[in-house]
Amino acid sequence: MKSLVRALALVTTIAVVSCNKQSTVEKLNPESNIAAAEAQPNRDAQLLAQLFASAGPKTQFFTVQGKEKVTVTTTNGNKYTIPAGALRRKDGSAPTGPISVAIREVLSPKDFVLSNRPTAAAGAYLLSYGEYFVRATEAGADLVLAAPIAVQTVVRTQVRPQEKVPMWDGDTTVYYTINGYNQLNQPTSVTQPASQDPGINWTQAPDYALFNATTGTLDFQLSQLLQWRNCDVFSGSTGPKTTVLGYFDVYNNDTPNSSPEQPSMLFFKPRNINSVVKFFNIILNAPAGFNGFLSYQSIIPVGQQGTFLAITALNGQFYAQLLDATIAAPASGTNYTPVSFNLQPVSASQLVSMIADLNNR
């Protein structure tokens, strides 16, 4: 196991501002502006979340006319073809003014980390062909689809020998209902969004994306707006699996009490696979030196090569370590594989560079 530690003294001070605790969907959706009752992250978690938000993938905006068929191309080279008349007001009428189309794409390990959108289902990693979100508005009012948007995406990772790629639904937001009374003391209810902890819960959708030999793209359709869709295939790993426990030497003890952002985090990037797994489970009742995270039980393939990224924000300072590793089998008489981390102080820019380096692993 080879440790790649990037360590330099912190030379940059970052001002802490109010952290946007909304998920990506909520930030794009003006109807989700009801404050959700949830635990508050600590100051270090806010500092880390602020950095991730500033360095993460950005929304791209396009102006179109609803009565015309139009194809827009993002800076990532992906094409979205909107049929004429496909965009409608919620009452079914056709928009008459210019339409703003907002598109967000999460495509690489760096994006997966900075957007808190790991590519895993029940802790098992998925080979990702990207995550996509589209919103359309007229004068600020959300529109709906009367016909699907055709999407052609550039294939940026290895192609598995299969005819179709499963589509997935998932988000960092869950919705719950509060029952109460309105201004006339009549029973009523309100549906409110809240950030889901822990993170994404990807569920397989009934449709698929198809490889297009003519264009060299992966093609699929979006039948709804304001909904994340993910193109993923199963990892296909076979053989024995283990539970990985990651021990942090620098750990923020407020991590179990901070939600949805956390001041300590652990990620695993499988070697040469466009995927990132986030370890959400916290080691409980740990003695000094053994605080940290563990994977789902018996989920990480023994012999899997990859890179861990351990991160902690503590007292306004960032600490991190990149660690290349091959997942070992549990020692005799145990049912887990331990990995110890030696986190070093890093600046904000150094941390972002370490996250970006996952794209090359």
Residue ranges and their predicted role:
Residues V11-T12, V70:
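Exposed boundary/loop context
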Residues K2-L10:
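Sec-dependent signal peptide recognition
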Residues L10-V11, Q22:
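A detector of low-complexity, intrinsically disordered, Ser/Thr/Gly/Pro/Ala-rich segments
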Residues Q22-K79, G85-T96, R104-D111, N116-R361:
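Proteolytic cleavage junctions
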Residues A15-S18:
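C-terminal motif of bacterial Sec signal peptides marking the signal peptidase cleavage site
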